[in-house]
């Protein structure tokens, strides 16, 4: 009988293992990446194309193209496509981010012979009906209009202007009225450039038997792509910056939004693996410095978070929070104070243990399921991180010392390069 009055022992996480990834190239030059684990007869298929919102002439056009991709082909209507995927109990989506467009299918292995021909048809013969385009455009316009009224959107956008070079797509103020003028021909042109014009990188996870692999190979070897297509436009973030704060007055807002960025610059892999838990100690979890002082002790915000944003343009330490407009400057001052303390005072063994346990717990989520492992490998590909980074991160956190955290904070938490943006009911 278990004595439930006694706390169970705490087990330290160690020896995390990721299922290895295998790669091979199809006869048409497309690379397939496979993570094979026989948990159940289900698989996830992800196709990634170079080309995202920063790379195309119209980010709204790309957003509409991805939302319309499943809404009709030369052989099937939108309703028929929806019914077929639902009938076979599958989940399908198409999305885009800054530099990639993604098509994802999760399905039972036994349904693949019925679903993959439809997938190939969607990727090669989508029609983008005009009536569907009109409905999606209205929905996108309403969503973008609403988003622009939020303090979170405005502060994030304002902060980007401080570390992205002028004319970078990240800070170009697209006119949402352009959404109303996007035509079917515009959508088809983007479809031809991104989906049909670029060889995708294919990722597979699940119980990938020889039978399943044969079906997948036979399908995607018939995927025809052009030699030319959408290219990625990578413009590095600014490194030679000096601390500054920009404010945007938005009247009648209950909360103000605060975004802080510190460009990292040249950071070796070994330093990066130490900087991540250092950022966790500062503001990466509920028991972090910023949460304990700014949220719990001073009550200046409901929540605050620090993280490292890793992109193809470069790495940035980001701190995000919402607070009353009158408290925004005080929050920034306290953030700087906590950074300086982290630089000058060694953290205790108790705090280091808390950071290590939280960090390892987050790492363990990556290996929890075959699909989370696949997502990890995809994220490595999309931000240019080595595939062995998982093992290196685990090794680093087990060997991390208080001195490592102090050194990382001194080296990369450069408050002389701190860029802050505040949007809300504040004085400019």
Please annotate each region the language model reported.
Residues 17-18, 86, 242:
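Residues that act as N-cap/strand-start positions at coil-to-secondary-structure junctions
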Residues 44-106, 285-300:
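M16/MPP (pitrilysin/insulinase) zinc-metallopeptidase core fold and M16-derived inactive scaffolds
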Residues 21, 42, 100-102, 255-257, ...:
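A generic structural signal for beta-strand entry/edge sites
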Residues 22-25, 242-250, 421-422:
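Short amphipathic
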Residues 2-42:
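N- or domain-start disorder-to-order transition segments that initiate the globular core
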Residues 16, 26-27, 38, 95-99, ...:
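Short, ordered beta-strand-loop transition motifs
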Residues 1-6, 25, 80-230, 266, ...:
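Charge-rich, well-structured scaffold segments of protease-associated domains
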Residues 30-53, 58-59, 199, 228-288:
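His/Glu-based metal-binding/catalytic segments typifying zinc-dependent metallopeptidases
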């Amino acid at each position: 009988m278990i004595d439930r009055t006694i706390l169970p022992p705490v087990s330290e996480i160690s020896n995390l293992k990721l299922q290895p990834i295998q790669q091979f190239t199809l006869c048409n030059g497309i690379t397939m990446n496979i993570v094979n684990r026989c948990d159940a007869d289900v698989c996830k298929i992800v196709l990634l194309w170079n080309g995202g919102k920063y790379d195309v002439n119209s980010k709204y056009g790309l957003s509409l193209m991805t939302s319309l991709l499943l809404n009709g082909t030369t052989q099937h209507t939108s309703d028929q496509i929806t019914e077929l995927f639902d009938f076979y109990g599958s989940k399908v989506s198409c999305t885009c981010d800054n530099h990639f467009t993604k098509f994802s299918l999760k399905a039972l292995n036994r349904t693949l012979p019925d679903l993959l021909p439809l997938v190939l048809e969607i990727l090669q013969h989508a029609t983008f009906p005009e009536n569907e385009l009109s409905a999606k455009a209205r929905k996108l316009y309403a969503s973008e209009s609403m988003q622009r009224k939020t303090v979170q959107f405005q502060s994030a956008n304002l902060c980007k202007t401080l570390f992205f070079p002028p004319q970078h797509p990240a800070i170009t103020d697209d006119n949402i009225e352009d959404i109303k003028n996007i035509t079917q021909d515009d959508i088809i042109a983007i479809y031809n450039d991104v989906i049909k014009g670029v060889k995708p990188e294919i990722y597979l996870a699940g119980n990938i038997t020889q039978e399943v692999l044969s079906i997948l190979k036979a399908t995607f070897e018939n995927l025809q792509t052009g030699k030319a297509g959408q290219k990625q436009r990578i413009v590095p973030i600014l490194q030679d910056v000096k601390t500054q704060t920009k404010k945007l007055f938005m009247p009648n807002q209950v909360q103000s939004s605060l975004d802080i960025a510190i460009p990292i610059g040249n950071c070796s892999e070994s330093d990066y693996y130490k900087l991540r838990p250092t950022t966790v100690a500062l503001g990466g979890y509920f028991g972090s410095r910023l949460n304990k002082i700014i949220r719990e002790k001073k009550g200046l915000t409901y929540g605050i978070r620090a993280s490292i944003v890793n992109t193809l343009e470069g790495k940035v330490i980001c701190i995000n929070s919402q607070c009353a407009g009158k408290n925004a400057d005080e929050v920034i001052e306290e953030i700087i104070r906590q950074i300086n303390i982290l630089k000058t005072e060694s953290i205790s063994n108790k705090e280091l243990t808390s950071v290590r346990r939280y960090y390892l717990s987050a790492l363990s989520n990556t290996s929890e399921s075959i699909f989370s492992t696949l997502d990890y490998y995809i994220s490595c590909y999309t931000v240019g991180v080595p595939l062995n980074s998982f093992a290196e991160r685990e090794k680093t956190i087990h060997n991390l010392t208080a001195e490592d955290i102090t050194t990382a904070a001194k080296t990369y938490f450069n408050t002389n390069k701190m860029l802050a943006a505040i949007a809300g009911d504040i004085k400019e």
